[in-house]
């Protein structure tokens, strides 16, 4: 049996990773998604075990210490990580996995899975990214300022990735991702 492939989707907060991921999973039912663990509070509409596994800081530290996480990172005062077992099991069973993770985690994955396809999603411009963050209506002015500062740093790392895509249109970006995934999974 052929082993599955690992695909990493990264980019600044507000660039559209979640929307793209949701559409990709709908279009590619054979693609598996790893549900991340986080210490942040659930946002409206998020479902435990589907959107994230929500844990407290002590539980997250225990997961790090017992090496239950493939990668983990801190973002905006909260921790995020990818449970190791589901990723390994799916890949061994021949299913390709997609991870939506932060830059720090993507760098960790590169060391563990050097053959992973790493895709960086870029905004059309910083002004557009700022507009998207405000449009979500879920962050304070201070939080948005921090996210934009971090986005500037993250954008500098885009060239570390195998592929960089500007998300100026969800449909155009999805078409590009479809082509990329088709060739990568062959």
Curated annotation (Swiss-Prot):
Keywords: ATP-binding, Cytoplasm, Kinase, Nucleotide-binding, Transferase
Classification via SUPFAM superfamilies: P-loop containing nucleoside triphosphate hydrolases
Ranges in a coiled coil: none
Pfam families: Guanylate_kin (PF00625)
InterPro entries listed in its UniProt record: GK/Ca_channel_bsu (IPR008145), Guanylate_kin-like_dom (IPR008144), Guanylate_kinase (IPR017665), Guanylate_kinase_CS (IPR020590), P-loop_NTPase (IPR027417)
Binding-site positions, ATP: 11-18
Known catalytic reactions: GMP + ATP = GDP + ADP
The keyword Cytoplasm is assigned to this record: yes
GO cellular component terms, A-Z: cytosol
Described purpose of this protein according to its UniProt entry: Essential for recycling GMP and indirectly, cGMP.
Family in the record: Belongs to the guanylate kinase family.
EC numbers, comma separated: 2.7.4.8
CDD domains tied to this protein: GMPK (cd00071)
Designated name of the protein: Guanylate kinase
One GO MF term attached to the UniProt entry: ATP binding
Residue ranges occupied by any Guanylate kinase-like domain in the UniProt entry: 4-182
PROSITE patterns: GUANYLATE_KINASE_1, GUANYLATE_KINASE_2
Keyword DNA repair part of the UniProt annotation: no
UniProt-listed PANTHER family: GUANYLATE KINASE, GUANYLATE KINASE-RELATED
Subcellular localization(s) per the UniProt record: Cytoplasm
Domain of life: Bacteria
NCBIfam families: guanyl_kin
């Amino acid at each position: 049996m052929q082993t599955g492939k690992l695909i990493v989707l990264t980019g600044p907060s507000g660039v559209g990773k979640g929307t793209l991921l949701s559409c990709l999973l709908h279009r590619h039912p054979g693609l598996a998604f790893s549900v991340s663990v986080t210490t942040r509070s659930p946002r409206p509409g998020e479902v435990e075990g589907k959107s994230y596994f929500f844990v407290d800081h002590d539980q997250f530290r225990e997961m790090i210490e017992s090496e239950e996480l493939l990668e983990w990172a801190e973002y905006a005062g909260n921790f995020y990580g990818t449970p190791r077992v589901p990723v390994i099991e799916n890949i061994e069973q021949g299913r390709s996995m997609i991870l939506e993770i932060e830059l720090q985690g993507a760098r960790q994955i590169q060391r563990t899975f050097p053959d992973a396809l790493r895709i960086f999603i870029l905004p059309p411009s910083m002004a557009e990214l700022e507009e998207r963050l405000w449009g979500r209506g879920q962050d304070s002015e201070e939080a948005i300022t921090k996210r934009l500062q971090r986005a500037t740093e993250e954008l500098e790392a885009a060239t570390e990735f195998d592929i960089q895509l500007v998300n100026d249109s969800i449909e155009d970006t999805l078409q590009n991702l479809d082509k990329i995934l088709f060739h990568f999974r062959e």
